[in-house]
């Protein structure tokens, strides 16, 4: 296989970092992954020990890589008081004025809940402080790209799912109780989801096509837009026996949030489940090509079957 180049994944232990690294390695890149500890070795990936608090560590991890996947993230309740912006600034500094390409995972927080078709040219009008933070961080990347310091490519996606994730919507909510499916919204409300193996391949595809793109790009990954009813049906299809169905107890999450800061922040984003916000991008669809995404039932079966193993 021809070597496509070298990529560094900052935050290799995170869900996005792992799947992006796997996709780049499978596509023929030399892959480095940086984190404080090598929690899960990935075939074809060189681990580099480093701390995201250290510009020097990140600069060393980036080295001669042409592409950097910024998969760093902070705990959900630690985004505030300038922490996320400071992390973004450190990565920009570590990139230097080299013209290298950064690929950055965006999300839907930037947009008003009333928006139904969320396209790249849609106005960014965040509903919550968390969305305002994301808007500021993306502007920092755009400013660095406009200055000519680097190329910045944002790939925006919905909620993640994949086999064997911990701390995700299935592990913590939808399938947290044995024998029960907790529907996160009314059954007729759609939601944007991203199957992480597909999203990882999309990161690689954009990196490979980077020379055909502008200095700053904002892409929206359509993934799978499905209603909670369709989600429940896909889980039932993959389950070894029929599961009871109930509504996710958002009121309970709110009460837990009085004592648990992470749950408090999760509940603040409840509005995303009450509004069908569909990510759309015909330009990205053309780059990725037809039939890019894993079929929904297949992706869901792979994701949920481990929950039923041995049952």
What does each model-found stretch correspond to?
Residues 174-194, 198, 205, 212-214:
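A conserved pocket-lining segment of Rossmann-fold NAD(P)-dependent short-chain dehydrogenase/reductase
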Residues 38-98:
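NAD(P)H-binding glycine-rich loop region in Rossmannoid oxidoreductase-like domains
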Residues 1-6, 202-266, 286, 293-311:
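Mid/C-terminal beta-alpha module of Rossmann-like enzyme folds, strongest
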Residues 107, 139-163:
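Conserved beta-loop-beta element that borders a ligand/cofactor-binding pocket
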